[in-house]
């Protein structure tokens, strides 16, 4: 049949073209994309196209080079779990409702270091994302950090502070955090004045550098339910999977510890590695709202693991039978990994590009009226298609007069209760069965609404976790069944001891309030092997923060688990006792006649599964490929376990939280000698004094010097590294310093500061210039040589005792690369320096003298680092907090700031991962 026929007037009508035009109109859809500058751009695409087509159009519109960090998130998803547009699936299968479709352009993968982003424009997009997330309460932020971040944002937009232009109230048109306090602007203005000279790019870089330290930075949350029908949050991030309940982080599962992630129907499973001290595999199970939410979480885990942990994505199945006849999902992340993205950025990025920044708009993304946007977007002149040329990033009109407020729940500690991940003892015949009454789920914007607060916010703090969407549906209690027998009566049991029910055990479940009685005795060193955090003074329940492998806490039955809440200690209610009191109660158990510690805990309920598999294999599973780190020192179990815990603590922030809780001065230690009138002038700082019990005594009538002995014993070896930690000499204490050096027989001095930093004298020059000699009382010091590099200096000296007519050779090593403020950006130079110190002291028994300015901060960092290296060489686990505690037992305040502690922890992890120091077959050398 021909498509053309002749009309009487001699004209033609093209039927086929009309049919195609009609079909094209039916298959083209409009997609409204909310960009990070709060503008909406409409694009027209074919609904049969893959998602990658729409992504490419958006990337082209933004002229974005480093694309793999970003994605499109469905704005009108009806679940509480965010869904990303899959680039490999047709658009019509992902966007079910009618056109126009609404999506948010967002950062999908948050890098751990902004230096990995090669283009300033990419960092600007990150900056917009985080700023918006903090403003809407999606990303919680302490007020002091929020003020710092806001000051960098102001510097980026307004430039340098100008007293004549930036009058009082110049920030009144801006909103930075939910429920912004009245004095918040003053704090921002004060910090803004300190950023003079920073360009917009530098200010934004500093913004990202500060934001990456936030607890919830880069965490993608998915809502789930526990066995008691309580809400929990499952967070997916670069380092692994987090579990939150009642706004308290309950568990962290690093990719290092995960063997497999899978799901079946509405059940999501995490299978953990079997450790050497464990007898059974561990399988964790979680209930999701529906099948799609479960698969969404699973895909998020696959994508995050592949992007951050692998060098390249796994290749697709090439075998015909393996591809078409295997059960489960064939989904694989196929974009670039972080390693590939960084390399691509280095090769393709245009670091000199110029773009226009958008002025701030206080309106939040959640206030976007998608209905109005949808109506406006249907106008043809507002559409872009893939045929349009690329544009420069769109500008934005100034709307500073707008205002934004948002209800936010106040951050409050909560009783942890028991986190029922419903991990249960299960035989192969058992299966998960969940039941739910039919219900509807309210459609909401992907930007989560804040739930009504039960308390009036007092401090303007944003919520600790993303605010929960309101929902109409309600979930019924989830039951587990074994054949015809209902197991609901057993769901409150806290531990399933593998013995006959007739036999009683010394430990076991208490029927009331789901409590568990745990008994243990200390090891030969008087330790139980667990740490706790919280207390009445911290307004937090007392929670078990760490259980060391192979210790009494780990081996007792029932086992004490991380996340368990301690209710009673030896029958004593600790609800109104401080953290230090709780620790003393635990330690006092070692001194009692029975020597037994009895704990009543509300369990975290992470239990082992008898069998690895269910009745049938899960429908979808993902077995993470091993990253290079996984294969390091596999045989050194205890050492490897401690490194995993350290990496986990750095990611989650528990490392710094535990450091903050550690006493700065050991209880019961006195410092009376330092406060005697004749000694006060010998202290560089009024509040930094040596313990009386461990101070170095000089011979003679005036025996005082601000210095302490510090001995660090390395277990399973004969090594005891001896140090003298002291302050940097003052002009009138140089004689005392050299007297101490002579009397202690020290042949090496380690100096960790320059003489002047930021205009302040940190240490007097207590040695002569090269080829010169100087006298200090009865001691003459001659400097023979001075060599070095930009990071450190070696000086060879002779110390001559004029009274005894004796001389000794000594070496001074000075580290000069420590910045005036903060800590080094890279630990490489410092680690080289520590290695040189170790080489110089090899075979020497006498103590080495270590000092900075106060003799506590950088001095503590060096001692911690060398101790950790020795522990690694001896195949011993490394727990930095224990090292700091040992040092503070001998000199107060060792390692002065959290940034110093984080620096040394990261350096220890680097030494282990990169093989800087390796376990030795013998441990005779220091």
Swiss-Prot record:
Q: What's in the keyword line of the UniProt record? A: Cell membrane, Cytoplasm, Cytoskeleton, Hydrolase, Membrane, Phosphoprotein, Protein phosphatase
What is this enzyme's class at the first EC digit? hydrolase
Tissue and organ expression note:
Highly expressed in testis. Specifically expressed in spermatocytes and spermatids within seminiferous tubules (at protein level).
Q: Which residues carry this modification: Phosphoserine?
A: 474
Which intervals hold domain FERM?
A: 29-312
Primary subcellular site in the record, as a coarse category? membrane
What's the family?
Answer: Belongs to the protein-tyrosine phosphatase family. Non-receptor class subfamily.
Q: What is this protein called?
A: Tyrosine-protein phosphatase non-receptor type 4
The gene for this chain is Ptpn4
